[in-house]
Amino acid sequence: MAELTALESLIEMGFPRGRAEKALALTGNQGIEAAMDWLMEHEDDPDVDEPLETPLSHILGREPTPSEQVGPEGSGSAAGESKPVLTEEERQEQTKRMLELVAQKQREREEREEREALEREKQRRRQGQELSAARQKLQEDEIRRAAEERRREKAEELAARQRVREKIERDKAERAQKYGGTVGSRSSPPATDPGPVPSSPRQEPPTKREYDQCRIQVRLPDGTSLTQTFRAREQLAAVRLYVELHRGEEPGQDQDPVQLLSGFPRRAFSEADMERPLQELGLVPSAVLIVAKKCPS
């Protein structure tokens, strides 16, 4: 049975002649399977139908056509050779085999593309899970840092309160000891006096207490309040700075100047007062201040 050439087989399967010749040429004329692989891999290339610069007949290794031969010797030799002619049944059988081969190649290509798509999807999901895990870890770290900061601030506040309580207890003990010693040193009335009217004990003038800390509560314009413990010798400017840093406005916004007022007696503190210590301003051991927006001068 005569066989179709690779070029004829590709044309029989529906490939354009120019594309089939190009496939055979670029695969080194290694057969129909190699040419079919090339055709399926490059069917979407924009230049798949562009002709090669080298004559395809030289690359394919086929004999030149009678019109390409020069001289009477060429035409005579072409006329003397006869090409085997396939019967219709042989042509159909060979075409069937080629179509089955094309279908097999197509299935292999689809399976390969499906595997690649599945692998890309797995990669996408894996990257998504890694990104989600990284975001969750970042959120957990932020929550943990915020909780640690709150615990630290609360511990500092409790420690400050404890120091104030201990100071108060020490002062009470000192006063009690001093007061008790004065009463014990007084002489009792003579026994011969039948019934002297007891005189009230002489009151010692209260000892002026020196505080080293003061507790300031600041009421903000929105109704909220801030409470903080300062050293008695700190300047009032430290309180104003604390208010400006903690009054809850968004970072980056223009903040109005802060004006501090005392509730009772009513008093507006000036810029000169900002340089004076809290003890000198009468804000020790505790005081309530009011924040008002300072009108620009």
UniProtKB/Swiss-Prot annotation:
- State the protein's name: UBX domain-containing protein 1
Quaternary structure note: Component of a complex required to couple retrotranslocation, ubiquitination and deglycosylation composed of NGLY1, SAKS1, AMFR, VCP and RAD23B. Interacts with HOMER2. Interacts directly with VCP. Interacts with BRCA1 and BARD1; interaction takes place when BRCA1 is not autoubiquitinated bur is strongly enhanced in the presence of autoubiquitinated BRCA1.
Instruction: Name the source organism.
Output: Rattus norvegicus (Rat)
Map out region (Interaction with BRCA1) in residue numbers.
43-297
Residues the record lists as Phosphothreonine modifications: T207, T229
Query: What residue stretches are annotated with the UBA domain?
Result: 2-42
UBX domain residues are 209-291
Provide the gene name from the record.
Ubxn1
Q: Which residues carry this modification: N-acetylalanine?
A: A2
Cite the Pfam families for this sequence: UBA_7, UBX
